[in-house]
Regions:
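Polyanion-binding surfaces on beta-sheet-dominated domains and ring/shell assemblies
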Residues: 2-324
Length: 324
């Protein structure tokens, strides 16, 4: 992701700025809250100021730059697959457990995924009911993202149609919240799915027609999931006239509205969701969609490169885990 810096200088009189802030304050007092209104636009902010045009944020990143991310797989021993992702101050742990279950009536020849999200007490701001509501919101978002038929090959999880299938229980643990949790969680889920290994099974039938399931004892005789079409979430936060990716907590506090876009490795958008009390005009939405597709493709490439490198290292790769 390339950092771009554009400097625009324009002389603005003190009287002009005073008039602008007076109008902005009047809007706050009249509305009580923003309610989707772009205060900077309605108050008549002078056009062409440096804050509108510069591709520079407080921490030195460009508007389309992510913070440094650390990805590690196979960090929990008693799971079928696991991953830990640290994105800035945000810390996510995902564990996947494959268990046998019964296929759903509407899809008798497919397995399925179940998502559970726990907001750790290590994040004081997420204690109590607030954490429960956030966990439910994250789980519902993941269900929506993975509702696309091509995201995961669920037919490969079927053992015996209408009778047995693999159910993947995806447990998401939010260890620390430092902004942009949806993107970090989607990265961790994809990495954990890549790391998941499901034992191969054989269906044996005796003379009486009774079926038995036999699991392979060989740890290398397993099924690997194809994660090429698993989408990643790109959250774009609208701040003033611009939108940024991978917002920090401070930037999220300044944003009136954000757009969550799930993007595949080919840049296709599989779902979208607006969060926040503010509104987004059509032009901004189209710009954010284009940015999400562009940034999403780069994110997939970078993540897949890391996953492939870890895969090639095999057992020789150094493990950091929770003691690093």
């Amino acid at each position: 992701m390339t950092t771009r810096s554009i400097s625009v200088h324009q002389d603005i009189s003190t009287a002009s700025w005073r008039s602008f802030w007076q109008k902005a304050a009047a809007l706050f007092l009249r509305e009580g809250q923003l309610l989707g209104r772009d205060v900077f636009r309605d108050a008549g902010c002078p056009v062409g100021t440096a804050s509108r045009a510069e591709d520079l944020r407080v921490d030195g990143r460009g508007c389309e730059d992510y913070r440094c991310a650390e990805v590690e797989t196979d960090v929990v021993s008693n799971t079928s697959g696991s991953a830990r992702v640290k994105l800035g101050e945000t810390d996510i742990l995902v564990g996947i457990k494959a268990e046998m279950g019964t296929p759903k009536l509407e899809k008798p020849d497919e397995g399925y995924l179940e998502f559970f999200v726990d907001c750790s007490s290590n994040s004081p701001e997420l204690e109590g009911r607030g954490g429960e509501e956030l966990g439910t919101d994250i789980a519902n978002t993941l269900y929506r993202v993975f509702s696309c038929e091509n995201s995961v090959d669920l037919k490969s999880l079927c053992i015996n149609p209408k009778e047995h299938c693999w159910v993947l229980y995806v447990d998401v643990l939010l260890l620390e919240c430092g902004g942009n949790i949806f993107d970090a969680i989607s990265i961790a889920v994809k990495a954990a799915l890549f790391n998941t290994r499901i034992p191969k099974v054989r269906v044996l039938e005796d003379e009486e027609g009774t079926k038995e399931i036999e699991l392979s004892d060989d740890p290398y005789d397993c099924i690997r999931l194809n994660v090429d079409e698993v989408p990643c979430i790109v959250t774009l936060s609208k701040i003033g006239y611009r939108h940024v990716v991978d917002a920090t907590l401070q930037e999220e506090a300044c944003s009136l509205a954000s757009l969550l876009i799930s993007v595949t490795s080919k840049g296709a958008i599989s779902s979208m969701k607006k969060v926040g009390k503010g509104s987004l005009d059509p032009e901004s939405i189209f710009e954010m969609m284009e940015t999400g597709q562009r940034v999403g493709k780069s994110l997939h490439i970078a993540l897949q490169k890391i996953l492939d490198e870890e895969e090639n290292l095999g057992t020789s790769r150094p493990k950091v885990g929770f003691l690093g």
